[in-house]
């Protein structure tokens, strides 16, 4: 059927990873060195201990969105191979698929030992801005951005 071709095509394509690869290539040609991007918590980083929320979120991605899961894994690999100064901020929306209210306290976990789904858009934007402005902030790392509590 036509629907099966669409699903098959979606699983084979990796637009986010390919887009990041093109951006990294252009940055290298232009002499730019700092790249900050956002990915899903299902991207595994070296040293992750993966708590129950991270494991569940990864399993859901593998089962319900295998194409997106594949794209995220490739994105992590593209960045890890790059010699640029990058930071991949891993996130996960809340159970309802929406971000949480403004002013919610958020934190960072470098090893995945602490993680809760959901976060404030404003808090994420502020963190991304700070990470882009500070050349050394989480350089070549994949911090998990999560809500506290």
Positions of predicted regions on the chain:
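Catalytic helix-loop patch of NAD(P)-dependent Rossmann-fold dehydrogenases
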Residues: 53-82
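Short, small-residue-biased leader/transition segments that mark boundaries at the very start
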Residues: 2-7
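Glycine/proline-rich active-site loop of Rossmann-fold NAD(P)-dependent oxidoreductases
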Residues: 82, 97-106, 131-140
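Mid/C-terminal beta-alpha module of Rossmann-like enzyme folds, strongest
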Residues: 32-35, 111-149
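Conserved catalytic-site region of short-chain dehydrogenase/reductase
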Residues: 41-47, 94-98
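Conserved beta-loop-beta element that borders a ligand/cofactor-binding pocket
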Residues: 76-97
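NAD(P)-cofactor binding segment of oxidoreductase domains
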Residues: 8-35, 74
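Conserved catalytic-site loops of classical short-chain dehydrogenases/reductases
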Residues: 33-39, 87
């Amino acid at each position: 059927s036509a629907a099966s071709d669409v699903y098959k095509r979606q699983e084979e394509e990796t637009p986010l990873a390919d887009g990041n690869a093109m951006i990294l290539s252009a940055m290298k040609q232009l002499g730019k060195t700092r790249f900050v991007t956002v990915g899903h918590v299902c991207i595994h980083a070296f040293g992750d201990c993966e708590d129950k929320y991270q494991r569940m979120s990864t399993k859901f991605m593998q089962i319900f969105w295998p194409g997106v899961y594949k794209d995220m894994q490739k994105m992590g690999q593209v960045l890890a191979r790059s010699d640029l100064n990058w930071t991949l901020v891993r996130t996960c929306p809340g159970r309802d698929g929406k971000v949480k209210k403004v002013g919610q306290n958020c934190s960072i976990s470098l090893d995945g030992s602490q993680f809760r789904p959901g976060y404030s858009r404003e808090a994420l934007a502020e963190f991304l801005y700070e990470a882009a402005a500070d050349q050394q902030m989480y350089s070549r790392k994949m911090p998990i951005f999560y809500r506290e509590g």
